[in-house]
Amino acid sequence: MQHIGFKLNDKEYTIPILKVREVIKSPTLTKLPLVPHYVEGVTNLKGRVLAVVNLKKLVGLEGKSLGDNIMVVGSDHIRFGFFVDSITGILNIDESQFFSPSQIKQLGCSIQISNRYVTMLDAKSLIPAEDLDGSGGKLFLDPDDPVNG
């Protein structure tokens, strides 16, 4: 299965490439009141509102730098973007590379690739379920998904 690799601080992560819609340069964001602490704001992406998340805050990493790129992902009727420090490339991963499940529920598992370990993210679990419930969850709905139309 193909994944796209990226870095947050000095740690490398991957996400299945089929969940990635695109990678864009960091646009101007509009701040919103009363959103979860990890939501940096929203932007207009091709005529659609896109919520942009600080993944470092969401997974408990230190660091104030947000990175220059935003990875736009979609999974199970939601769509959002998150800042990445850099893209490391495309990785071909097979199940024999799975190392162990992570203690953080948003993270999938660790994978050994050559001499390094990479953490695989579970796109559909990145946003906490409680933040998808109620009116706040509308921020993350994919407007192009017929279920949300």
How should these model regions be labeled?
Residues 1-149:
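An acidic, low-aromatic, low-complexity terminal/linker signal
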